[in-house]
UniProtKB/Swiss-Prot annotation:
Chain spans, region Disordered: 1-22, 221-332
Ranges of biased composition (kind: Basic and acidic residues): 272-281, 288-302
Keyword Coiled coil tagged: no
Pfam family, one: FAM131
PANTHER family the UniProt entry points to: PROTEIN FAM131B, PROTEIN FAM131B-RELATED
Transmembrane domains' residue ranges: none
Bias (Acidic residues): 323-332
Modification Phosphoserine occurs at: 47, 114, 117, 295, 297, 313, 317-318, 322
Family: Belongs to the FAM131 family.
Record's protein name: Protein FAM131B
Residues bearing PTM Phosphothreonine: 316
Disulphide-bridged cysteine pairs: none
Keywords: Phosphoprotein
Gene encoding the protein: Fam131b
Length: 332
């Protein structure tokens, strides 16, 4: 009786979940193990939720299959017919007929399409699909070919740029070698020949700051001077070059003029007073030629100027050594 009363109580209070829980908790105290078998049908009934989900899923798949068979296929055929009409009527193209006959042409085309059999309609549908696929495939192939051409152009431009840079570097190196070759021979050749423009006092004026810096920055007589002026051998001993004869060495900086005149027998310029007494026409011409050649000569780098100054100092030191040898011979 207790079990039946508890079952009836639970059935009466079933709409309220909280009350059923309290009833179950209250009745569970008085329930025995034999009476628990009456709860199993409820648990089994609650476990059918998975079965309901599977049924809903299967029913949904069945409904979707039926919709596909009865709704989707006819709709696809209808869309295909619309596509056939678009292809048949030639929409998107320039009208080849007059506007007043357009309605008649559309009606005629519609009647002609409707008169086609199902096989002809299917054939036209497949032809339209194949045409669209062919157009899209051709477009993709064109794009891929354009991408390939761009890649090939870029790949060909890279080695061209590398070759251009290599050739440019080789050209610059050859130009540097050509520029250094004549400059290496300038101090030895022109200083030994007495053509280094240091004999005139005008070359060392305080106003010309570029010539005061060092003898290496002085102007050399280049090939243009050989063409415009007579050579040292043609001038002879009577005509001095840069204020001195061809056999006489140029004056050395820092050497006493009296000692140099006694040892080498060289008549050095005593100053601007003696230069004013004799005619200055040849010296002025030579100074003008030196300055013109200096303006035409290329600017030297600091490294090149230091190298040239060292070479000039070597030449001058060799000249001092030769003067010492001559002095020793004269004393003996």
């Amino acid at each position: 009786m207790d079990s039946t009363s508890s079952l009836h109580g639970s059935s009466l209070h079933r709409p309220s979940t909280e009350q059923t829980r309290t009833d179950f908790s209250w009745d569970g105290i008085n329930l025995s193990m034999e009476d628990t078998t009456s709860i199993l049908p409820k648990l089994k009934r609650n476990s059918n939720a998975y079965g309901i989900g599977a049924l809903a899923k299967s029913s949904f798949s069945g409904i979707s299959r039926s919709m596909k068979d009865h709704v989707t296929k006819p709709t696809a055929m209808g869309q295909g017919r619309v596509a056939h009409m678009i292809e048949w009527q030639g929409w998107g193209k320039a009208p080849a007929i007059q506007p007043q006959h357009s309605h008649e042409a559309v009606r005629r085309d519609t009647d002609a399409y409707s008169d086609l059999s199902d096989g002809e309609k299917e054939a036209r549908f497949l032809a339209g699909v194949m045409e669209q696929f062919a157009i899209s495939e051709a477009t993709l192939m064109a794009w891929s070919s354009m991408d390939g051409e761009d890649m090939s152009v870029n790949s060909t431009q890279e080695p061209l740029d590398c070759n251009y840079s290599d050739n440019y570097q080789e050209l610059m190196e050859s130009q540097d070698a050509l520029a250094q070759a004549p400059m290496d021979g300038w101090p030895h050749s022109y200083v030994s020949q007495g053509m280094y423009c240091l004999g005139s006092s005008d070359a060392w004026e305080a106003s010309d700051q570029s010539l005061i810096a060092s003898p290496a920055t002085g102007s050399y007589l280049g090939p243009a001077f050989d063409d415009s002026q007579p050579s040292l051998h043609d001038m002879g001993p009577s005509q001095p070059a840069s204020g001195y004869s061809a056999q006489e060495p140029p004056p050395l900086l820092g050497v006493d003029t009296d000692w140099a005149s006694e040892v080498g027998g060289v008549e050095l310029a005593r100053g601007p007073v003696e230069e004013e007494k004799r005619p200055l026409a040849p010296e002025e011409e030579e100074d003008a030629g030196c300055r013109d050649l200096e303006s035409l000569s290329p600017r030297e780098d600091p490294e090149m100027s230091t190298a040239l100054s060292r070479k000039v100092s070597d030449v001058t030191s060799s000249g001092v050594q030769s003067f010492d040898e001559e002095e020793g011979d004269a004393n003996n």
